[in-house]
Curated annotation (Swiss-Prot):
It comes from Shigella boydii serotype 4 (strain Sb227). One of its GO terms (cellular component) is cytoplasm. This is Ribonuclease HII. Manganese or magnesium. Binds 1 divalent metal ion per monomer in the absence of substrate. May bind a second metal ion after substrate binding. A divalent metal cation binds at residues 16-17, 108. Its main location: cytoplasm. It holds the Pfam family RNase_HII. It is found in: Cytoplasm.
Protein backbone atom coordinates (compact mmCIF):
# COMPACT_ATOMS: atom_id res chain seq x y z
CA UNK A 1 0.00 0.00 0.00
CA UNK A 2 1.37 3.44 -0.95
CA UNK A 3 1.97 5.55 2.15
CA UNK A 4 -0.42 8.47 2.36
CA UNK A 5 1.19 11.93 2.28
CA UNK A 6 -0.69 14.46 4.41
CA UNK A 7 -1.56 17.95 3.17
CA UNK A 8 0.52 20.71 4.81
CA UNK A 9 -1.98 21.79 7.42
CA UNK A 10 -2.64 21.40 11.13
CA UNK A 11 -6.27 20.50 11.72
CA UNK A 12 -7.13 17.50 9.54
CA UNK A 13 -10.47 15.74 9.90
CA UNK A 14 -11.06 12.21 8.69
CA UNK A 15 -14.55 11.17 7.55
CA UNK A 16 -16.04 7.74 6.89
CA UNK A 17 -19.45 6.11 6.61
CA UNK A 18 -21.02 2.83 7.63
CA UNK A 19 -24.25 1.35 6.36
CA UNK A 20 -24.63 2.05 2.66
CA UNK A 21 -25.46 -1.57 1.82
CA UNK A 22 -28.00 -2.57 4.50
CA UNK A 23 -31.72 -2.70 3.80
CA UNK A 24 -32.63 -1.14 7.14
CA UNK A 25 -31.63 1.79 9.33
CA UNK A 26 -29.66 4.97 8.81
CA UNK A 27 -26.36 5.47 7.04
CA UNK A 28 -24.05 6.69 9.83
CA UNK A 29 -20.98 8.88 9.34
CA UNK A 30 -18.31 10.23 11.64
CA UNK A 31 -15.73 13.02 11.45
CA UNK A 32 -12.65 12.99 13.70
CA UNK A 33 -9.77 15.42 14.31
CA UNK A 34 -7.05 13.54 16.19
CA UNK A 35 -4.67 15.15 18.69
CA UNK A 36 -1.02 14.66 17.57
CA UNK A 37 0.00 14.99 21.24
CA UNK A 38 -2.22 12.04 22.23
CA UNK A 39 -1.64 9.24 19.70
CA UNK A 40 -3.94 6.21 19.65
CA UNK A 41 -2.29 2.86 18.97
CA UNK A 42 -3.94 0.25 16.77
CA UNK A 43 -6.19 2.40 14.59
CA UNK A 44 -7.27 0.43 11.54
CA UNK A 45 -10.27 -0.07 9.30
CA UNK A 46 -13.18 -0.90 11.65
CA UNK A 47 -14.09 -3.99 9.60
CA UNK A 48 -10.66 -5.53 10.34
CA UNK A 49 -10.96 -5.16 14.13
CA UNK A 50 -12.76 -7.41 16.61
CA UNK A 51 -15.89 -5.98 18.20
CA UNK A 52 -14.14 -5.85 21.59
CA UNK A 53 -11.20 -3.89 20.13
CA UNK A 54 -13.55 -1.52 18.28
CA UNK A 55 -15.46 -0.73 21.47
CA UNK A 56 -12.25 -0.02 23.40
CA UNK A 57 -10.86 2.17 20.60
CA UNK A 58 -14.19 4.00 20.28
CA UNK A 59 -13.95 5.16 23.90
CA UNK A 60 -10.28 6.09 23.49
CA UNK A 61 -11.02 8.12 20.35
CA UNK A 62 -13.84 10.02 22.08
CA UNK A 63 -11.55 10.75 25.03
CA UNK A 64 -8.39 11.76 23.11
CA UNK A 65 -9.59 13.37 19.86
CA UNK A 66 -9.51 17.16 19.56
CA UNK A 67 -13.01 16.92 18.13
CA UNK A 68 -15.38 14.23 16.89
CA UNK A 69 -18.90 14.24 15.53
CA UNK A 70 -21.47 11.82 14.16
CA UNK A 71 -23.77 12.41 11.20
CA UNK A 72 -26.57 10.36 9.72
CA UNK A 73 -29.18 10.11 7.02
CA UNK A 74 -32.40 8.34 7.94
CA UNK A 75 -34.12 5.68 5.81
CA UNK A 76 -36.72 8.18 4.52
CA UNK A 77 -33.89 10.50 3.39
CA UNK A 78 -32.15 7.59 1.67
CA UNK A 79 -35.42 6.78 -0.12
CA UNK A 80 -35.95 10.42 -1.15
CA UNK A 81 -32.38 11.26 -2.21
CA UNK A 82 -30.83 7.85 -3.09
CA UNK A 83 -28.07 6.22 -1.06
CA UNK A 84 -25.16 8.16 -2.61
CA UNK A 85 -26.68 11.61 -2.01
CA UNK A 86 -27.88 10.61 1.46
CA UNK A 87 -24.34 9.48 2.32
CA UNK A 88 -22.91 12.81 1.14
CA UNK A 89 -25.50 14.64 3.28
CA UNK A 90 -24.61 12.52 6.33
CA UNK A 91 -20.90 13.30 5.79
CA UNK A 92 -21.68 17.03 5.58
CA UNK A 93 -23.61 16.75 8.85
CA UNK A 94 -20.69 15.00 10.58
CA UNK A 95 -18.21 17.70 9.50
CA UNK A 96 -20.65 20.49 10.46
CA UNK A 97 -20.96 18.94 13.92
CA UNK A 98 -17.26 19.27 14.77
CA UNK A 99 -16.77 21.93 17.45
CA UNK A 100 -13.37 22.77 15.92
CA UNK A 101 -13.50 23.65 12.22
CA UNK A 102 -10.96 21.54 10.31
CA UNK A 103 -8.58 23.18 7.85
CA UNK A 104 -8.70 20.14 5.61
CA UNK A 105 -10.95 17.07 5.34
CA UNK A 106 -9.93 13.60 4.16
CA UNK A 107 -12.79 11.35 3.08
CA UNK A 108 -12.71 7.60 2.62
CA UNK A 109 -13.70 6.35 -0.81
CA UNK A 110 -13.95 8.04 -4.19
CA UNK A 111 -16.72 10.64 -3.82
CA UNK A 112 -16.37 13.94 -2.00
CA UNK A 113 -19.32 15.93 -0.60
CA UNK A 114 -19.43 19.72 -0.97
CA UNK A 115 -17.79 21.19 2.13
CA UNK A 116 -16.87 24.75 3.22
CA UNK A 117 -13.16 23.80 3.46
CA UNK A 118 -10.67 22.00 1.19
CA UNK A 119 -11.19 18.25 1.03
CA UNK A 120 -9.95 15.22 -0.86
CA UNK A 121 -10.91 11.57 -1.14
CA UNK A 122 -8.55 8.77 -0.16
CA UNK A 123 -9.18 5.34 -1.67
CA UNK A 124 -8.91 2.73 1.10
CA UNK A 125 -8.44 5.64 3.49
CA UNK A 126 -9.82 3.64 6.40
CA UNK A 127 -6.61 1.56 6.25
CA UNK A 128 -4.20 4.38 5.33
CA UNK A 129 -5.22 7.47 7.31
CA UNK A 130 -5.58 7.29 11.13
CA UNK A 131 -8.23 10.06 11.17
CA UNK A 132 -10.37 8.10 8.70
CA UNK A 133 -9.76 4.86 10.64
CA UNK A 134 -10.97 6.61 13.80
CA UNK A 135 -14.07 7.89 11.97
CA UNK A 136 -14.81 4.40 10.63
CA UNK A 137 -14.62 2.95 14.17
CA UNK A 138 -16.99 5.59 15.65
CA UNK A 139 -19.48 5.15 12.80
CA UNK A 140 -19.47 1.34 12.97
CA UNK A 141 -19.78 1.13 16.76
CA UNK A 142 -22.67 3.62 16.63
CA UNK A 143 -24.54 1.85 13.84
CA UNK A 144 -23.98 -1.63 15.32
CA UNK A 145 -25.47 -0.40 18.62
CA UNK A 146 -28.50 0.95 16.74
CA UNK A 147 -28.98 -2.43 15.04
CA UNK A 148 -28.73 -4.21 18.41
CA UNK A 149 -31.41 -1.86 19.80
CA UNK A 150 -33.63 -2.48 16.76
CA UNK A 151 -33.14 -6.23 17.25
CA UNK A 152 -34.79 -5.96 20.69
CA UNK A 153 -37.87 -4.32 19.15
CA UNK A 154 -37.98 -6.64 16.09
CA UNK A 155 -36.28 -9.89 17.22
CA UNK A 156 -37.70 -11.90 14.31
CA UNK A 157 -35.39 -10.22 11.75
CA UNK A 158 -32.00 -10.95 13.38
CA UNK A 159 -30.70 -7.37 13.02
CA UNK A 160 -28.05 -7.84 15.75
CA UNK A 161 -26.41 -10.58 13.67
CA UNK A 162 -26.51 -9.25 10.10
CA UNK A 163 -26.71 -5.50 10.92
CA UNK A 164 -29.41 -5.05 8.28
CA UNK A 165 -27.37 -6.39 5.35
CA UNK A 166 -29.27 -8.51 2.79
CA UNK A 167 -28.27 -11.95 4.09
CA UNK A 168 -30.30 -15.03 3.16
CA UNK A 169 -31.81 -15.02 6.67
CA UNK A 170 -32.78 -11.33 6.48
CA UNK A 171 -34.36 -11.78 3.03
CA UNK A 172 -36.28 -14.83 4.27
CA UNK A 173 -37.65 -12.92 7.29
CA UNK A 174 -38.43 -9.89 5.13
CA UNK A 175 -40.54 -12.10 2.86
CA UNK A 176 -42.17 -13.75 5.88
CA UNK A 177 -42.92 -10.70 8.05
CA UNK A 178 -42.83 -7.78 5.59
CA UNK A 179 -40.88 -4.55 6.10
CA UNK A 180 -40.62 -2.48 9.28
CA UNK A 181 -40.85 1.33 9.22
CA UNK A 182 -37.04 1.29 9.47
CA UNK A 183 -36.53 -0.53 6.16
CA UNK A 184 -35.38 1.42 3.10
CA UNK A 185 -38.29 1.27 0.72
CA UNK A 186 -36.25 2.25 -2.34
CA UNK A 187 -34.04 -0.86 -2.04
CA UNK A 188 -34.99 -3.76 -4.35
CA UNK A 189 -35.47 -6.56 -1.79
CA UNK A 190 -37.66 -4.29 0.37
CA UNK A 191 -39.72 -3.21 -2.65
CA UNK A 192 -40.27 -6.86 -3.51
CA UNK A 193 -41.30 -7.70 0.07
CA UNK A 194 -43.83 -4.85 -0.07
CA UNK A 195 -45.12 -6.04 -3.45
CA UNK A 196 -43.90 -2.84 -5.14
CA UNK A 197 -41.57 -4.67 -7.54
CA UNK A 198 -41.40 -8.14 -9.07
Amino acid sequence: MIEFVYPHTQLVAGVDEVGRGPLVGAVVTAAVILDPARPIAGLNDSKKLSEKRRLALCEEIKEKALSWSLGRAEPHEIDELNILHATMLAMQRAVAGLHIAPEYVLIDGNRCPKLPMPAMVVVKGDSRVPEISAASILAKVTRDAEMAALDIVFPQYGFAQHKGYPTAFHLEKLAEHGATEHHRRSFGPVKRALGLAS
